[in-house]
Amino acid sequence: MKFRESKNFSLTSISSEIQDFWSKNDIFSKSFNKKDSSSFVFYEGPPSANGKPGIHHVMARTIKDAFCRYKTLKGYNVERKAGWDTHGLPVELGVEKELGISKDDIGSKISVSEYNAACKKAVMKYTAEWESLTRQMGYWIDLSDPYVTYTPKYMETVWWLIKNISEKKLLYKGYTVQPYSPAAGTGLSSHELNQPGAYRDISDTSVIAQFKCLDGELPVKLKNFYPFYFLAWTTTPWTLPSNTALTVGAKIEYSFVKTFNQYTKKRITVLLAKNLIDKVFSKNFYKIDNENELDLFNQNDTKVPYFILESCKGVDLENLKYDRIWEEAPLPVDNPENAFRVILGDFVTTEDGTGIVHTAPTFGADDYKAAKSAEPEVPPLQVLDEKGNKVPLVDLKGKFIDNIGLISGKYVRNEYYESDSIPDKSVDVEIAIKLKEQNLAFKVEKYSHSYPHCWRTDKPVLYYPMESWFIKISDLSERMFNLNKDINWKPKSTGEGRFGNWLKSANDWNLSRSRFWGVPLPIWSNEEGTEHKVIGSVEELINEINISIEKGLMKTNPYSKFNIGDMSDDNYDKVDLHKDFVDDIVLCSEKGLPMKREKDIIDVWFESGSMPYAQIHYPFENKDLIDTKSNFPADFIAEGVDQTRGWFYTLHAIS
């Protein structure tokens, strides 16, 4: 059999001919304008046009296109609305780099208005490249009427959703220890930390620190062992100066052990969980059966003997006092008399460490909860800054405050330094060296473990005390878990395995982001924080501003040219809901007090998860599309597996 050979065969020419044919004959729009055809609902995950498309976008779009074309050929109407994700950290960090500024410069070297204008310009930088790729690969998506997340209509729907959540009593303000990215200058939500690759294996300096027990109110059964040290293990030595408690398990058995400090060679008695003695006293130690053999130890010996004494239960240790380990650190500003004592916690285990947990309430979620639940409550180590505000020993840049000894003004992690100014010794190493010299370090060694990193800056996160607005996901987790069973995941293991199990114990959603370019939290509060007003629409905001004008809190209404009820784009172009506009608006509380907007913007993942509603300006327009379920929920979504903890999660949570 002979096959005809085309000598002038050109894939490029054929591609152009097909594209021209589709364009001239309006084939794409005809494909989803079939009368009396059932709809197949597809949601397009919005890319950001501030970066160029990559090969992974081609792969994802190929899968999307194949299924949508198949359903079209089966007779369905398959509308495919394009979208642009225009807010968030990727945009802001790119603009900061381009302008040669940092977050701290915004509001001083450059106004918030100028900064947001630069972000708005940058976010559509590569639109032409995206549209070109879309055409070249034959991906059918409606680029003529995309949803754009920075538009007033989209933002208004996001506000409406927040108000709706508030009316369901699922929105609250809380002061908690939460993931925080010093490099990005903002808090993070738990689902952001569960992005693939967020946890990375790193090697840190770990310390088993010696906390010297005070003899003030020792029970009779423990007096015979005085003086002794509590042994507590940490993989974050930089948190030791902020220690205010040691946590033990009430039912755990703890043993007193006589030995020598391997660095100072001083004789010491230490206390740790009985089940962990063999693990802690490994390598450079050996067990003896007669206490008198300790007298045979020579300071030049390479191996250190230890002798096990009697044991007690964790409950016997409750409220014992100890010497603070970092003398240069100030006392807590609140109730210092309740600090530096042993408390009980049900999270303490004997799987690793020493069975005694170093507790710094300012830098650990479990630490914070344990300190709060203790009676009396253990205070966090906070001091007053120059403005009289309570702050921890580490600032929002990840740097120690001044006047706390050799660590003053240093970053808690070397990754926070500029590449040309990284010190030879990290703060962890410096702290370990000092504790060795003071006979307060029992063991110092490298420890490999998994540690969370910011998904956008690739820098390690801190757990930091902050006030934020949360969605009470914990009240919804069971329903979310059960509804997840109705989703037809491909492969099943993706949704029903790790993701499904994660939903069972999902944490409350931290909405607050300390940034500038995004949808502002639509919450106004009085100075005392006792009254709050959540705004759910442009109309509501205009009406509230008019009340403020009547009460003398504002002179003019910045949105006076907006015509309520007119849903045209031209009318909505008269409104800007971004931070640089709404932050100047003062509302009036029910008691007649001035109310200012809460300073943060909304987590950009909430924006993208609002897409089913916001893309059609629900409920202000197209209300029937959602209410009749003709355009909700989606029949088909296809994205990378990383979106199980991103867009898929937020779509699920918001719905």
Regions found by a protein language model. Give the residues of each.
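Non-cofactor substrate-recognition interfaces
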Residues: K2-S13, F32-S144, V220-F230, P237-S655
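Active-site cores that bind ATP or allylic diphosphates and position pyrophosphate for catalysis
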Residues: A117, Q178-L231, W238-L240
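Extracellular glycan/ECM-engagement signal in secreted proteins
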Residues: I165
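Acidic/polar loop patches that form or flank catalytic/metal-binding clefts of enzymes
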Residues: Y172-Y175, F442-V444
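Positively charged, low-complexity intrinsically disordered leader regions
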Residues: E17-S38
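Gly/Thr-rich phosphate-binding loop signature of adenosyl cofactor/nucleotide-binding cores
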Residues: K169
